[in-house]
Curated annotation (Swiss-Prot):
EC id: 1.12.99.6
Biased composition regions of type Basic and acidic residues, renumbered to the chain: 360-372
Binding residue positions for [4Fe-4S] cluster 1: C62, C65, C160, C194
Pfam family, one: NiFe_hyd_SSU_C
Protein name (Swiss-Prot/TrEMBL): Hydrogenase-1 small chain
Topological domain spans for side Periplasmic: 46-325
Stretches that traverse the bilayer: 326-348
Predominant subcellular localization, coarse grouping: membrane
Annotated organism of origin: Escherichia coli (strain K12)
């Protein structure tokens, strides 16, 4: 692959200047949370490494992951597709169709055996021998296994591929199955969400291209750089949660004031994703900022956890399990206790200082002799 076109060469061929290329590397480093100091390393990698071939296949899904990906802003999806990677097969985005598209698929997995990244959107249904999802005239499960056999790594796009999503909701008549339950001998990184945040998708690809490895993941296989914290942890309404200020109905005064949406069913306290920090639509907003609670779409089994508008009963708060009704009072109690302790300590310190202070008589000249 040494004679193949690199990312930098592809960008220069498209008329991108050196200055713009370095700016791109700086933005990529920032979006990955690596800091500006990593920009030179990203630049070196993209100047010297050939573009990675990517095969993107679709199982049971609604194509929302693709729709999200093409709206990426940092980096732009067009830069990822046309320059950063070599997206050789994606039956949604490619011009070829039918037999011609399948010939491309076979050529890529044969020519780049062991070198390409497999991106999977959707999941395989195992019921009725896989006949609930047909691709190229045969069950999708067969295509998935064939593509996975020669892949260097696999990306599970979205909640469908990661957990099963709505297709796997009870009673799961098609036996829709997450891909890690079917492919067990390959490294798989899960990027859940319905859909995932577009900038998260493109940033993960940038990381893999730059460092030739998967990003660090949690015990469930999600990249820590984007799924290491709950939406609740960085939510701008968090202060209202801690103060016990909650919206009680969609049209009340608390809703107009932007109070916490936890009582309206917001799943932010139990959902790990980057919505509250990265946001959507080029960082413009996210559901909670738009006035609607988080649905928890990045979590496993979110379709089977009751109504989207029923709140979580208990969540950890300040070392105890407090409900939304009591957490505000608890916070106020802690503050009141702290104020009380401070007041008592101040009074004791003041009395101690008063007892140690010499009297006015003791400081008068000659008093030492009189006392003697």
């Amino acid at each position: 692959m040494n004679n193949e076109e690199t990312f930098y060469q592809a960008m220069r061929r498209q008329g991108v200047t050196r200055r713009s290329f370095l700016k791109y590397c700086s933005l990529a480093a920032t979006s990955l949370g690596l800091g500006a100091g990593m920009a030179p390393k990203i630049a070196w990698a993209l100047e010297n490494k050939p573009r990675i071939p990517v095969v993107w296949i679709h199982g049971l899904e609604c194509t929302c992951c693709t729709e999200s990906f093409i709206r990426s802003a940092h980096p732009l999806a067009k830069d990822v597709i046309l320059s950063l990677i070599s997206l050789d097969y994606d039956d949604t985005l490619m011009a070829a169709a039918g037999t011609q598209a399948e010939e491309v698929f076979e050529d890529i997995i044969t020519q780049y055996n062991g070198k390409y990244i497999l991106a999977v959107e959707g999941n395989p249904p195992l019921g009725e021998q896989g006949m609930f999802c047909i691709s190229s005239g045969r069950p999708f499960i067969e295509k998935l296994k064939r593509a996975a056999a020669g892949a260097s790594a696999i990306i599970a796009w979205g909640t469908c591929a990661s957990w099963g999503c709505v297709q796997a909701a009870r009673p799961n008549p098609t036996q829709a199955t997450p891909i890690d339950k079917v492919i067990t001998d390959k490294p798989i990184i899960k990027v859940p969400g319905c859909p995932p945040i577009p900038d998260v998708m493109s940033a993960i690809i940038t990381y893999m291209v730059t460092f030739d490895r998967l990003p660090d993941v949690d015990r469930m296989g999600r990249p820590l750089m984007f799924y290491g914290q709950r939406i609740h942890d960085k939510c701008y309404r968090r202060a209202h949660f801690d103060a016990g200020e909650f919206v009680q109905s969609w049209d009340d005064d608390a809703a107009r004031k932007g109070y916490c949406l936890y009582k309206m069913g917001c799943k932010g306290p139990t959902t790990y994703n980057a919505c509250s920090s990265t946001r959507w639509n080029d960082g413009v907003s996210f559901p909670i900022q738009s006035g609607h609670g988080c649905l928890g779409c990045a979590e496993n089994g979110f379709w089977d956890r009751g109504s989207f508008y029923s709140r979580v009963v208990d969540i950890p708060q300040m070392g105890t399990h407090s409900t939304a009704d009591t957490v505000g009072l608890t916070a106020l109690g802690v503050v009141a206790a702290a104020v009380g302790v401070h007041a008592v300590a101040s009074a004791v310190d003041q009395r101690r200082r008063h007892n140690q202070q010499p009297t006015e008589t003791e400081h008068q000249p000659g008093n030492e002799d009189k006392q003697a």
